Amino acid sequence: MFRGATLVNLDSKGRLAVPTRYREMLNEGSQGQMVCTIDLHQPCLLLYPLPEWEIIEQKLSRLSSMNPAERRVQRLLLGHASECQMDNAGRILLANTLRQQASLSKQVMLVGQFNKFELWDEQTWYQQVREDIDEERSSKQPLSERLQDLSL
């Protein structure tokens, strides 16, 4: 399971160094093989260990290519999917097209989200966190049943 938000640097070649605490888990679970794609709803990238991505691919394969909305999701997620191999130094090369899509600069937030990571431009991440907190504090919407049952 991946959790926490860590500031990492992209080098001049577009590689990011995976924090040490995740490297062993990624090497054991996927031999360092990962897949990166865009997020459909946020200005970030999604980085999956290969076995987790294969589950997503199976779900995507069950969507109908005849349904325009389902085809669009397939096109966006699969069309932007890029395989990444963690090297011996624990670095992952992110495709330039993906870095541009998420407006990633030198400073990137690597955010654990259970079975995957989100990759955010640092400033965009902090802005999103502020917006999310403000939204939660001012929301007049009733909580969903699942959130009502969540005890922290």
Curated annotation (Swiss-Prot):
- Protein location: Cytoplasm, Nucleoid
CDD domains for this protein = MraZ_C, MraZ_N
What domain of life is recorded for the organism?
Bacteria
Task: Spell out the molecular function terms from Gene Ontology.
Answer: DNA-binding transcription factor activity; transcription cis-regulatory region binding
Domain (SpoVT-AbrB): residue spans on this chain: 5-52, 81-124
Q: Name one GO biological process term.
A: negative regulation of DNA-templated transcription initiation
The protein's matches in Pfam families, at most eight in alphabetical order, are given as:
MraZ (PF02381)
Keywords of the record: Cytoplasm, DNA-binding, Repeat, Repressor, Transcription, Transcription regulation
Family membership: Belongs to the MraZ family.
Protein name as it appears in the record: Transcriptional regulator MraZ
Q: Can you name the source organism?
A: Erwinia tasmaniensis (strain DSM 17950 / CFBP 7177 / CIP 109463 / NCPPB 4357 / Et1/99)
UniProt lineage? Bacteria, Pseudomonadati, Pseudomonadota, Gammaproteobacteria, Enterobacterales
